[in-house]
Amino acid sequence: MTSTSNGEPRSYWHATAPPPVPSAALPDACDVVVIGGGQVGTWTAYWLARAGADVTLIERTAISWGATGRNGGFVSAGLADGFTATAVRIGEEGAWGVWRISEQGREIVQQIIAEEGIDCDYRENGTVGLILGEDELDVKHASVNELASHGVAIEALDRASLQELIRTPLADEIAGGVFHPQNALVHSAKYLAGVGAAAQRHGARFCQANVTELQSDGDGTLVVTEQGTVRARNVVVGINAWTDELVPELTGLIVPVRGQILSYEPIPTTFTTGVGVAVTPTGEYWQQALDGSIVIGGCRDDAPNKDVGVRETVPTPDVISRIADVIPRLFPQLNGLKVARSWAGLMAFTADYLPVAGPAPGLPGVWVAGGFCGHGMPFGPRLGQLFTEAITTGSTPDALRPLSADRPTLTPVVSTVFEAVE
């Protein structure tokens, strides 16, 4: 089956995923309601359940149905706009603080997959960024040296070293690369379904329902859904591209951006690492799954307004056609790849390329996270821990301060096109 009942294309991850986590009836009340079955929501429910909270995770479709189940499957530490640009905006201390959240999240993924026995094709094979043209080589390798001096696991690769990682000849335009040996790859839907199942084992309740409104009510919040209302002392909103539906004060500050992806029919193992490149200004990325399929996305540069502000999750022929040209251009012997399916998903971006994570403005007792700029995979696990700490202690952890909704660099998105950050 290549599409859902409403005609929305199914991703490779969804098509090869286990059955959805079963849904329970909505309770009348609980300690915490978590809204959204993506990275933030599922991990927050997991950590709260482990801490002994009575937690209900509400998702309108299924766990990993949004961005997570439509992405490239990378668990990569780092910052969407890079360290240098982020440090200019918020200072080096703040930039390293956010970087550490992503590194800690990556470590949590490895740890919990092992502890909970999650079968999700986890491979800590690293990711490599391709450098196109000799002019870029010195610039990129200089940034590698800066990060390495701060203890980041990163390596500069010349063309010969890069060729050792990739089992097909490189095109002449590839000059070298940047290798991140500690980054990992997963089957996105299997991975998050496994976290959700683990959360249930620890006592979390999963309910399929569509939340329509949050109402402050004394010392708690009424979570209004189409299926009923739940009273909770605390609420966590983790719906990323749809954040403004429940937290209106973030309208225009967190905006949806469509990402388009395709998968190829299986071929013999060629790419063991994740791969990123900037053939277009908005960037491309891919991994080869264990069954030999290649999942590749990017090329937003070919879409009107770079797909910023788009809420439809249907791919467009122009962008998919451009994506299909990327690998054959860079690896000439792979010019016979056959497209198996294509799909789209919604990311969420902010003007300063940093997520929002902390108290929701205008909603006492509500916490919110969103705007991950295509990098939610490493942030979700650690933010779930930090939200659990905030709810159990009643105070905001210092680690969340650079991501607060009232930071001066979080301005309305007007014309930013978010280049090369997928």
Please name every model-derived segment.
Residues 1-32, 419:
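Extreme N-terminal leader/targeting segments of oxidoreductases
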Residues 50-70:
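Glycine-rich FAD pyrophosphate-binding loop
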Residues 78-161:
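Dinucleotide-binding Rossmann-like beta1-alpha1 core, especially the glycine-rich loop
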Residues 92, 119-129, 161-198, 202, ...:
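Helix-loop-beta segment of a Rossmann-like dinucleotide-binding subdomain
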Residues 145-148, 173-233:
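Helical element adjacent to the flavin cofactor pocket in flavoenzyme catalytic cores
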Residues 214-295, 309, 420-422:
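Flavin-dependent oxidoreductases
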Residues 268-363:
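Active-site lid/adjacent beta-loop-alpha segment flanking the redox-cofactor pocket in flavoenzymes
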Residues 325-422:
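C-terminal catalytic lobe of FAD-dependent flavoproteins
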